């Protein structure tokens, strides 16, 4: 059931530019400093999910959690490319001891991967992003990057089986369940401090 949310988040992240921004781009292309290129962002982050908490009968929950990683690879294979630049966020596949830090499972790994994704986007400077991922939290970086790029002239539509509005310290520590609150500038202080903008 969570994969449907991931697929939809990938589609929605690709259409993140608002009507107002599209009009500005089409009528004022020569004077705008923004690029209108579309990139594919392969973001196979799996650490935001805690499969063991969601499906306790799974025999090897850590191995199953990496299914998010495989899902990103499958989406990359199945979704038509269209010739745009493809960036792949480096995501660790190592499973060590999974830790909750300040209320977020695997927070330090997620923070490193967030920084890497942002660095890639800043270097590429895309106007649109098609995100193919991993868990729901892979939408946080693209949404907040585009919110900063278009000065808040971005609307976020989040359709998922779960609202993804939990906070650090809530009973479930998976970051994928905190994706919307992170996009809105709330949540783990270290992660939120790295995000370029908030979606109001």
Question: Which residue stretches match the model-derived regions?
Answer:
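Bacterial N-terminal signal peptides that target proteins for export
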Residues: 1-7
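Hydrophobic h-region of N-terminal signal peptides that target proteins for export
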Residues: 10-19
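Conserved alpha-helical scaffold segments that buttress catalytic/binding sites
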Residues: 25-200
